[in-house]
Amino acid sequence: MQFLNTFSKSRISWLLLLLCIVFFEGSALFFQHGMKLGPCVMCIYERVAMMGIAFAALLGAIAPQYAIIRWAGLIAWGYSAVRGLQLSIEHVGYQFNPSPFATCDLFVQFPNWAPLNKWVPWMFEAYGNCAEVVWTFLGQSMPQWLVIIFAGNLVALALIVIAQFFSKKTNTILDM
């Protein structure tokens, strides 16, 4: 735990998290533009959750040695990973438990103050079907892989949060 405590206070740990998210976002863009797999509304929302983790990584990388910055990054990471897990579980439900009464929206709905689909349509515009399985790897669909990825983020986060309470002892004159 001491290692994770020390590691979380280094900029490299937060940049490593950012690098992982850049890889996942790059993969998503490759699927969209390279393989011509149209993202659905849930895919876009899951992408935004990934971006939230990227934001958390950037926040934590600012000054990880300061507890307030580190905890802000950890909280943002946790919120984004939980929301991403919720969205991807819901998406798996649309794919494997189809119902005419449970469908995703036809269009992404962002707040008026941040219409990401208008600002960056090549990344945030949805035109796929949430219930359609368009790609699998090792027998898992894309949202199933996202469940694994977001759950993995939460496991890593839990370990790092627990490690925050295991700081290195400092020697005092009374310890000698």
Curated annotation (Swiss-Prot):
Disulfide bonds join C40-C43, C104-C130. The chain crosses the membrane at residues 14-30, 49-64, 72-89, 145-163. Keywords: Cell inner membrane, Cell membrane, Chaperone, Disulfide bond, Electron transport, Membrane, Oxidoreductase, Redox-active center, Transmembrane, Transmembrane helix, Transport. The keyword Lipid metabolism does not apply. Its main location: membrane. It comes from the Bacteria. GO terms for biological process: protein folding. It is found in: Cell inner membrane. Residues 31-48, 90-144 are periplasmic. Residues 1-13, 65-71, 164-176 are cytoplasmic. SUPFAM superfamilies: DsbB-like (SSF158442). GO terms for molecular function: electron transfer activity; protein-disulfide reductase activity. One of its GO terms (cellular component) is plasma membrane. The keyword Transport applies. Belongs to the DsbB family. HAMAP family: DsbB (MF_00286). Required for disulfide bond formation in some periplasmic proteins. Acts by oxidizing the DsbA protein. This is Disulfide bond formation protein B. It comes from Photobacterium profundum (strain SS9). The gene is dsbB.
